[in-house]
Each structure stands twice: as C-alpha cells, then as structure tokens.
Amino acid sequence: METIKALTDTAALQIETYPSLTSKEKVKRLIKSCIPGKRPAPLDAFSWPNALLGKGLLCAWEAVGDESALRAVAGYLKRWKTKGFPIRYVDNLMNGTLAMELEGLLRGGADSWTASISVSGTSSATASVSVSGIFGADEVSEYLTLCREAVDACAAWLKAAPRTENGLLPYRKQHPDWLFADALAMVSPFACRYGKEYGDKALSELGIRQLTAFMEKGMDIKSGLPYHGYDEKNGMKYGIIGWGRACGWMLLGLAESLPYVENEGTFTALEKAYGELLTQVFQWQREDGGFSWQLSAQEGHADSSAEGMIGLAYALAKKNFRKAAFDSESICTFEAEMCVNENMTRLCEAAKRRIINGKVGSCSGECLGFAEYPQVYGSYPWGNGSILGFLSLWSKEWEE
C-alpha cells in the first residue's frame, strides 16, 4: 500500500497544478505567439490528463480509503466550476464521467466503496469508509450540486456539439470527419451512463454508435488491433496499427460504457469485441511483463501509460461488469485462454518497476496527431493516473 500512497500523493498534487510550464516552455510559447499565424494552444487544466489523474485517485480511494484522494477529486471539480465548466473539446467530457462517479459516492449508491485499510500498522482489514464521514453535511450538499451542474454542462455541450455526417463526434473541429480512438473513452462512457441514469435515449445511442463505428471502420483486419483513427468520409485509416494508448483508450471506452448498455444484443456484441481486443492486445505482452509504445515493437521502448491504461481497463471491467444487466462471457473466455492471473501479475510487476519516488517513469510523451508519436519518455499525468488506478484496483481484486 505504500506504493499506492506515494502515487496518490503525486496524483493529488498534479491534478491541482498540471499543466505547469518550465521556463524553457514559457519562452517557446512566447516566441511562437510572435510568429504571424502561429498561436500556441491555450493551456487546459481540465483536460484528459487531469481527468485520468482523477480516475486514478478515485480508484485509490476504493483501494485504501485515502481521504486526500477523494478531496483532491472534489477540489478539482470545484475549480472547474469556478472557471465556468469550460468545455473546449471532447476531452473535457471525461470530467462529466468523473462527476457522476463522485455523485454516486456522495449519494451512497451502488458506487459506494468498501476499502481495505491498514489498522494500526497491522495487516489490512476491511472496513466500510463512509463519504459522509469525510465530508460534512453541508459539503455533501455542496458537492452534490456541483456534480449535477458539471454533468448538466457536459450533456448540454454534447448535445450541441458538431457531428459528422453519420452523427458521431469528431475529435477536433479542424478535421470534422476524423474519428480518433482516444474519443471512445471520452465520449462513450459519459454518453452511455448519462443516457441510462437520466433517461436520455439519444445520448445512449450516441455513445454506442461511437464505439460500434470504430469497431467497424477503425480496425486492422489482419491483427485485430486498432489504427489510431479513420476518416469517415473516405474510409482512409490513419496512424499506426496497435499504438499502445489507442488500445488503452478503446478498452477503457468499452469497460466504462458496457455496464450502462440496456439492449442485450448490443451488450453481447460490444462485450465480445472487448474480449477479442483484450486477447489480441495480450498476445503482444513483452517478456518483461509490460507493453511497448507500439505493441508490436517488442524491442522498442516500453510505455507505462499503455501499460496503465490496458491494466486499468481490465480491472475496471472486472469491477463494472458486475453491475451490468447481462451476463459477461468474454471476460471468462479471456481469463481461460490467457492465464490472466499470471499475465496480469506480470503486468502489475512491470508497472511497479516504472515507479521511482512516487512518480511513474517510462511514459511516452503527448501524441501530436495521427502518426506523430514523439519518442520522448518521462513522468506524465497519463502515466501516473492510469498506473495508480490499475495498481489500486488490482490490489483490491487480489484481496477479494
């Protein structure tokens, strides 16, 4: 649990301070702003890196009942409200999913967690940790209102956002026909959960279509792995096959959306696709237990963010599919075929080796677009958040 605590402290700090620029980065932005037609993109403190940190922190709360993890997420959403819930891209919708997760905790519903906590330095004991025991009644009321406002803001933006000809959400308005794997974990979990919990059939269908369209048009038939994305208008597939984070985005999108799919036929088809993709991904597990930045690049650099997202997606599926209305068969098939306990343990150990002083290293830098994958590795929020979430949930899974 010391590892999870150290990662939690890092994530709690990063979710409050990211992005922060070095002096060198500030100079670069200043120079770029002086070039006609070149304006640096505005910094976004509420984008997907921060939301991934929040997801990891909520997983840490589940594993060890760490009050600082829960307060960090609540404080993050409060800062987002203070800024007026800015939503520039589909990335920001992940905050809506985070708000629904926190709302479930505050209401004491199905998402309330029982944490394994250390008692007086002895072996861990299971105890019910009440959110109301951390937040006072006034705070609970304040945060419930905050969560509802955040969710409403995301739903309103999603309903008004420009769509492709087939009614899907492009990743960026500059390319209105481009569909990215990244968006599957940004749009679908929010749309599917909102649709079920708020009775909005149109958003439920949008979340499902976003997933099924990519399964039909964004995959490499031979390997069963995704391209980074595709052009809806001409059908061209872009990026590399089997980019590690693209696989992670897809698996996360499916794992977090499926529990809220209400049609049995649709659930079965998507759950089967999840199991098949997971099986193909683990065919490329490295000898050291991890995953490369591009899965097939076995002698290339390991990428802790790919490892964290893939591991987190599996751990979330194990947790979330218990809430689904229908039986899950593909998880059982995957576990039988892939010696899952052994391979997930190997992945867990590989992830732990990336951690130095509470920070996850060997994380690939931010992707700049289709086929733009800088070979720069270090410690980034998407590595810290996803590894924290994976290790937290997997440690709890083992204890259970």
Where are these regions (language model features)?
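Short, contiguous, pocket-lining structural segments
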Residues: 45, 179-186, 199, 206, ...
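Extended ligand-binding groove/face enriched in aromatic
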Residues: 71, 82-112, 135-231, 237-240
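Inter-helical turn/loop segments and adjacent helix faces that build the functional surface
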Residues: 64, 109, 194-205, 257-268, ...
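Ser/Thr/Pro-rich low-complexity tandem-repeat tracts
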Residues: 111-112, 116-120, 124, 128-141, ...
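Alpha-helical scaffold segments in carbohydrate-active enzymes
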Residues: 59, 79, 153-160, 186, ...
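Oxyanion-binding "anion nests"
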Residues: 249-295
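CBM-like carbohydrate-recognition segments
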Residues: 2-51, 59, 63, 79, ...
